Amino acid sequence: MEKITGKNNDIIKGVKKLFTSSKERRAQGLFVLEGARLVFDVLNSFYEVETFLITESANERYFEQSVLMQKKSKASYFISDTLSQKLSETKNAQGVFAVCKMKSDNINLQKGKKYIATDNLQDPGNLGTVIRTAEALG
């Protein structure tokens, strides 16, 4: 993997721009994940990984997941701890970042209709509660 050390690198500038600008995220159709758990959860998802960035120390800590992520991503880079701190939106950077492609769900919603959206319901009984509440509210 190639190592990026300078903050003026185009890849680093692009990731920082995605972090700070929702307009840029929508325009490019990309978003950034930060932190080991979020980034490595992508391994079990349908999201496409454009770029994977990791510090050498984080690579040692999460070696197995890092190898899998390098295979899943289109481009992978080592970054310095200093760059990781500069990129990070958190106080204590974990040194793991991924730039992923947004999914565009073209749902044909009809005006005047009512819809319920749920995500990751863990208890089937909760769906019944949601439906009953929606019915009660009209």
Question: Where are the predicted features?
Answer:
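Short connector loops at helix/strand junctions that flank enzyme active sites
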Residues: 47, 91-93, 111
